[in-house]
Amino acid sequence: MNNETIAKAKRNMNKSIEVYQSNLATVRAGVANASLLDRVMVEYYGVPTPLVQMAGITIPEPRVLMITPYDKSSLNDIEHAILASDLGLTPANDGNVIRLIIPQLTGERRQEIAKEVGKLAEEAKIAVRNVRQEAMKALKKQEKDGEITEDEERRLEKEVQKVTDESTKKIDQMADNKRKEIIQG
């Protein structure tokens, strides 16, 4: 018997991994990457708007991001949003475009970023464990309500644990790869 609880747990764990993956993409590794700006929100006519919807982002050089606003009047708003973000980058505004120079990472900064990757990984693993906990509760309820037998419950609990272990392993692997990328620069 294939249980809907298992399928739902797999979907939710995969969503947690996808969120972690998108968060990892915004972690700076010393090279220009447009996804660094994915979480930057610009106050535009009183409405928080994602920067990526307000400007074209190009990479003219390996360590330079160039932001060309669709509306030139939003240039200062974009500059303020970048300064207010947690990117730690200083925008250079020439009146037409904003340039972000991605500095070389120092050894100390690389270690800080590697720790941040670890924190993000731990948050993702907590999300996976929460999904596991919900699935286990649902299985216990199904057994209590007579929908599944006690043996089926045990078998399905093992399956949930297997999916949890696989998800956790995948998160650890992604974190290790990102740490290597950061440390090696």
Curated annotation (Swiss-Prot):
It comes from the Bacteria. It is found in: Cytoplasm. CDD domains: RRF. Keywords: Cytoplasm, Protein biosynthesis. Its main location: cytoplasm. Residues 138-185 are annotated as: Disordered. SUPFAM superfamilies: Ribosome recycling factor, RRF. GO terms for molecular function: ribosomal large subunit binding. Gene3D superfamilies: 3.30.1360.40, Ribosome-recycling factor (1.10.132.20). GO terms for biological process: translational termination. GO terms for cellular component: cytoplasm. InterPro entries: Ribosome_recyc_fac (IPR002661), Ribosome_recyc_fac_dom (IPR023584), RRF_sf (IPR036191). It holds the Pfam family RRF. Belongs to the RRF family. Responsible for the release of ribosomes from messenger RNA at the termination of protein biosynthesis. May increase the efficiency of translation by recycling ribosomes from one round of translation to another. HAMAP family: RRF (MF_00040). This is Ribosome-recycling factor. It comes from Lactobacillus delbrueckii subsp. bulgaricus (strain ATCC BAA-365 / Lb-18).
